[in-house]
Curated annotation (Swiss-Prot):
Short name of one Pfam family: vATP-synt_E
Gene3D superfamilies on file: ATP synthase, E subunit, C-terminal
Protein name per its UniProtKB record: A-type ATP synthase subunit E
SUPFAM superfamilies per UniProt: V-type ATPase subunit E-like
GO MF: ATP binding; proton-transporting ATP synthase activity, rotational mechanism; proton-transporting ATPase activity, rotational mechanism
């Protein structure tokens, strides 16, 4: 073997060693890149999932807030229309107080209360429109004082001076009580339900 062959052989051997080392280094670099890539993918996947979860929670919170706001708005709107019905009923009281049944009811209540008072002094409050009806029932009874109340829409309110007791048969009070007890039914009629 001559020198050149020996040199070639040595160079080839060194080349092979370098090539093997480079191949190992390349494989190691690729392995490190793949591991880094996988780690980065996992890390960002976790961050993305956390952001998605947080966003979902925010959306659910906003959705719940909007549902509450919508319910509140609906309740306000329902209350508005129920109050409109109440106002219309109040407007109709003027027609009710003109009926014979109304006047008969006032007379019946007064007759019963005057009988039960047994000489106690009373003051009967009524609307100016009902004064003549009340005067007819009271007649010359000295224990009864009649006073008009411009705020009363109809009906009577009786104050017993001896006991300090007041019995209220005013149409407004009766209407309020009936309306409150029927509020659910009125809501169902207006907006559907049950």
């Amino acid at each position: 073997m001559d020198f050149e062959q020996l040199l070639d052989k040595s160079l080839n051997k060194v080349r092979e060693e370098i090539k093997t080392e480079l191949s190992k280094s390349l494989d190691e670099a690729i392995k490190l890149l793949n591991e880094g890539h996988t780690k980065i993918i996992q890390e960002y996947t976790q961050r993305i999932n956390e952001l998605i979860t947080k966003t979902k929670e925010e959306i659910e919170g906003e959705k719940a807030r909007l549902e509450v706001e919508n319910k509140r708005t609906l309740l306000v709107e329902k209350e508005y229309w129920i109050n409109k019905v109440y106002e219309r009923v109040l407007e109709k009281i003027g027609e009710v107080v003109k009926t014979k049944e109304y006047k008969d009811a006032i007379q019946s209540i007064l007759n019963k209360e005057i009988k039960e008072m047994e000489g106690e002094k009373i003051t009967v409050y009524c609307s100016p429109n009902d004064k003549s009806t009340v005067e007819k029932v009271v007649g010359n009874n000295k224990n009864v004082t009649i006073k008009t109340d411009d705020k009363m829409l109809g009906g009577i309110r009786i104050y017993y001076e001896g006991s300090g007791l007041t019995r209220d048969f005013s149409l407004k009070l009766i209407l309020d009580q009936v309306f409150d007890s029927m509020r659910g039914k009125i809501s169902d009629m207006l907006f559907g339900g049950k």
